[in-house]
Curated annotation (Swiss-Prot):
The complex is composed of one ATP-binding protein (MglA), two transmembrane proteins (MglC) and a solute-binding protein (MglB). Keywords: Cell inner membrane, Cell membrane, Membrane, Sugar transport, Transmembrane, Transmembrane helix, Transport. It is a multi-pass membrane protein. The chain crosses the membrane at residues 17-37, 53-73, 107-127, 128-148, 181-201, 231-251, 257-277, 306-326. Belongs to the binding-protein-dependent transport system permease family. AraH/RbsC subfamily. The lineage of its organism: Bacteria, Pseudomonadati, Pseudomonadota, Gammaproteobacteria, Pasteurellales. It comes from Haemophilus influenzae (strain ATCC 51907 / DSM 11121 / KW20 / Rd). The gene is mglC. This is Galactose/methyl galactoside import permease protein MglC.
Amino acid sequence: MSALEKNKSFDLLKQNAIYFVLLILLGIIIAQDPTFLNLVNFSNILTQSSVRLIIALGVAGLLITQGTDLSAGRQVGLAAVISATMLQSMENINRVFPEMGQIPIPVVILAVCAIGAVIGLVNGLVIAYLNVTPFIATMGTMIIIYGFNSLYYDAVGGSPIAGFSENFSTFAQGFFRVGSFKLSYITIYAAIAALLVWIMWNKTRFGKNVFAIGGNPEAAKVSGVNVARNLVAIYMIAGMFYAFGGMLEAGRIGSATNNLGFMYELDAIAACVVGGVSFAGGVGTVIGVITGVIIFTVINYGLTYIGVNPYWQYIIKGSIIILAVAIDSLKYAKKK
């Protein structure tokens, strides 16, 4: 084999190493239990992927700008708890706010998304105008949000918030059945969210600005892009995606606590990187994000399905994250 062919083979391995590793893991799962490959599991994987996809779409926009958001999971938890207290059934004897009537679902969506937008606004302002690095800024808001959420959670009883209205349960847990396959409503919401993000990234000036900022902030500024304003906007949009995802997650699970959303941001970031969204900025596709989320969910679901110890699952997921980021760094180093 010539040196050129060896280099090509090495480049191919480097570009696709993470997929080879994940395929090996999937092969091990199937070998351990061939019943993993069935329509019921496929339906469950799609449903579990859906909320994670909505969250990952928010995170992906930030990664494209060379940013990140460690507060994403805590924002999901805050939205879940707030929406849960607003959407309990009127017949629920443990209803948090018994004096309130049944609040329409669209009103709750608007309320939690507004809260998410405000949190995103704070993150964006701190990062864009105070020049605090995204890692530090969002780590701070992560802690603050968890504190506020825990105070609120304790104030409304400090126990899992459940007993949702029938309308909300149907909204979050409903599905269309086709034979033994169930297409959940949540999957449809995620598909709509993905379509909206695709349009935003590919068909709007704002999307082009976001990619320009990620590719080279200084060049974007020279070309007339208001970098600070666009950064604030992308963090606000991300906050709204987290909020909607948190509301859906509460409904999907059937309850909410202040710890819901823990580590969701790491899963989202890892899924984005596996799907080709670069930490170096300026690179990413919606299809890639979808692929990354589904791959990660298949691995999570599969490891649980074959009974792998949850602690080993943390070790495996952490290793995948390190490998994905390392490969991304190697790709970027070569381009530099």
